[in-house]
């Protein structure tokens, strides 16, 4: 059986409905054989793992743990649905206080245990806010895209781009973690390959990326 990658994928909140379905979907799509399931609720987590193992998926290396350090260490991809569920009578905003704290703690754990993770997906509500609290994934991808265009290389050769803050012109666009074709971006900025002025222009394009798309298309969504 061929997989898209052999790198580790961690599913956070795997004992829940969304998390367990994400685990099954990842396995059936042959994303990677190396999948780790994490949830603080041990019995439910073990039940999900047993159910997946009983399916007899070929080539699957499935592990599970309630230790967040063990779950995240070595992970290159993470999907997190590890927030509280919305109950009857609750609004999305009612979830914010508790789930924002969960998202903040999750972000700190990612930084501590797998700082070289390639992609993080946050899908617990209110997802538009919890996702931003954890990692500004869309804006980080925009930074990678702009750097790839500038250097005329594949986006796959631009790694570890990071942006933080709100989804607008007040966001912070960092160079400290990024690498371009294996070379730290900080070592390139200020050279003829990427002058300080060009870097400032790229930062501006990233923070105004959404507005630019709207100007070009006349609308924001498909």
Question: Where do the protein language model's features map onto the residues?
Answer:
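Generic hydrophobic/aromatic pocket-lining and core-packing "Φ" positions
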Residues: 23-24, 107
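C-terminal substrate-binding/catalytic lobe of Rossmann-fold NAD(P)-dependent dehydrogenases
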Residues: 132-133, 139-222
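Rossmann-like NAD(P)(H) cofactor-binding subdomain of soluble oxidoreductases
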Residues: 92-146
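Conserved glycine-rich cofactor-binding loop
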Residues: 15
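Redox-cofactor binding/interface segments in oxidoreductases and associated redox assembly factors
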Residues: 79-80, 122
């Amino acid at each position: 059986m061929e997989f898209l990658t052999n790198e580790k994928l961690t599913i956070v909140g795997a004992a829940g409905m969304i998390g367990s379905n994400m685990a099954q979907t990842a396995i059936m799509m042959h994303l990677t054989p190396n999948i780790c399931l994490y949830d603080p609720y041990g019995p439910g987590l073990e039940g999900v793992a047993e159910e997946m193992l009983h399916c007899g998926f070929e080539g699957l290396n499935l592990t599970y743990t309630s230790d967040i350090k063990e779950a995240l260490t070595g992970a290159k991809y993470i999907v997190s649905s590890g927030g509280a569920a919305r109950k009857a009578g609750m609004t999305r905003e009612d979830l914010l206080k508790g789930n924002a704290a969960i998202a903040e703690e999750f972000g700190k754990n990612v930084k501590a245990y797998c700082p070289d993770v390639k992609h993080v997906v946050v899908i617990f509500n209110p997802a538009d806010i919890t996702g931003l609290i954890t990692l500004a994934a869309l804006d980080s991808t925009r930074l990678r895209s702009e750097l790839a265009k500038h250097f005329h290389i594949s986006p796959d050769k631009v790694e570890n781009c990071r942006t933080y803050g709100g989804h607008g012109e007040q966001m912070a666009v960092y160079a400290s973690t990024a690498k371009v074709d294996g070379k730290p971006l900080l070592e390139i900025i200020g050279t003829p390959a990427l002058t300080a002025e060009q870097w400032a222009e790229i930062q501006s394009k990233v923070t105004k990326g959404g507005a630019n798309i709207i100007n070009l298309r006349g609308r924001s969504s498909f």
